[in-house]
Swiss-Prot record:
Annotated transmembrane regions: none
Protein's UniProt name: U1-lycotoxin-Ls1b
Keyword terms: Disulfide bond, Knottin, Secreted, Signal, Toxin
Annotated GO MF terms: toxin activity
Tissue spec: Expressed by the venom gland.
Length: 107
C-alpha cells in the first residue's frame, strides 16, 4: 500500500511539473504575441496621414479601424497618381454619430 501511495505521489508531482512547464510556455507565447501586437500598434498610420504604400496599416479609431481611402490626383504634367490617406468611412461616421447620440440620451 505504501508503494502505491509513493507511486501516486510521484505521478502527481510529475504531472503538475509538466503542466506548469506547459503553462510557462503558453505564457511566454502569449507575452510575445502581446508584444508583437503592441509593436504593430505603434507602427500603425494615424488618421489623415498617407497610407499609399501600406493600405492595411491604418490605426484604430474610437470604434472602428480607420480605412485607407484613395483618390486619383492629376499632376500639372497630366500624370495620374494615386494618393491615399487613413480616414473614417461615411458609414462608420454615421455609426459613431448614432452611438454618441445614444450615449448623450441614455447617459
Amino acid at each position: 500500500m505504501m508503494k502505491v501511495l509513493v507511486v501516486v505521489a510521484l505521478l502527481v508531482t510529475l504531472i503538475s511539473y509538466s503542466s506548469s512547464e506547459g503553462i510557462d510556455d503558453l505564457e511566454a507565447d502569449e507575452l510575445s504575441s502581446l508584444m508583437a501586437n503592441e509593436q504593430t500598434r505603434k507602427e500603425c498610420i494615424p488618421k489623415h496621414h498617407e497610407c499609399t504604400s501600406n493600405k492595411h496599416g491604418c490605426c484604430r479609431g474610437n470604434f472602428f479601424k480607420y480605412k485607407c481611402q484613395c483618390t486619383t490626383v492629376v499632376t500639372q504634367d497630366g500624370e495620374q497618381t494615386e494618393r491615399c490617406f487613413c480616414g473614417t468611412p461615411p458609414h462608420h461616421k454615421a455609426a459613431e454619430l448614432v452611438v454618441g447620440f445614444g450615449k448623450k440620451i441614455f447617459g
